[in-house]
Amino acid sequence: MESKVEQGVKNLNMENDHQEKEEKEEKPQDASKRDPIVALPFEAGDYYVPRGGRRRFRVRQPIVHYRWDLMHRVGEPQGRMREENVQRFGDDVRQLMEKLRERQLSHSLRAVSTDPPHHDHHDEFCLMP
């Protein structure tokens, strides 16, 4: 009798173990069987931004970067803002701003005008006969 009872207990334990194993195997499958993300419908005029880890890229302005670099390139921290350093720093920033302004103007002028700069067209727009 005891052997039948022991066999029954063993069978129950084996069935429970088997069920637990099946449940553990089903959990990862459920994660992989998830429905794909469907775009939310939106009406005309509405703007939908998906939530999540969005990175915002900040464009650095070159002048600001140059100023920071120049400030930290100066010698020892005690002498960082002595008069000669301040004057040199101002001169460097002024030169960099002039270079940047020239480059920006050259690009904008190139985009606006296709005619060579030596032509003078002021008489073409004269309304006098």
From Swiss-Prot:
GO terms for cellular component: cytoplasm; nucleus. Residues 118-122 are annotated as: His cluster. It comes from the Eukaryota. Pfam families: BEX (PF04538). Primarily localized to neuronal cells within several regions of the brain, including the olfactory epithelium, bulb, peri/paraventricular nuclei, suprachiasmatic nucleus, arcuate nucleus, median eminence, lateral hypothalamic area, thalamus, hippocampus and cerebellum (at protein level). The modification Omega-N-methylarginine is found at residue 51. Its main location: cytoplasm. GO terms for molecular function: metal ion binding; molecular function inhibitor activity. InterPro entries: BEX, TF_A-like/BEX. GO terms for biological process: apoptotic process; negative regulation of protein ubiquitination. Keywords: Apoptosis, Cell cycle, Cytoplasm, Metal-binding, Methylation, Nucleus, Zinc. Zn(2+) binds at residue 126. It is found in: Cytoplasm; Nucleus. Residues 1-37 are annotated as: Disordered. Residues 15-36 have a biased composition (Basic and acidic residues). The keyword Cytoplasm applies. Regulator of mitochondrial apoptosis and G1 cell cycle. Regulates the level of PP2A regulatory subunit B and PP2A phosphatase activity. In absence of reductive stress, acts as a pseudosubstrate for the CRL2(FEM1B) complex: associates with FEM1B via zinc, thereby preventing association between FEM1B and its substrates. Belongs to the BEX family. Interacts with LMO2, possibly leading to regulate the transcriptional activity of a DNA-binding complex containing LMO2. Interacts with OMP. The histidine cluster (His cluster) and Cys-126 mediate zinc-binding. This is Protein BEX2. It comes from Mus musculus (Mouse). The gene is Bex2.
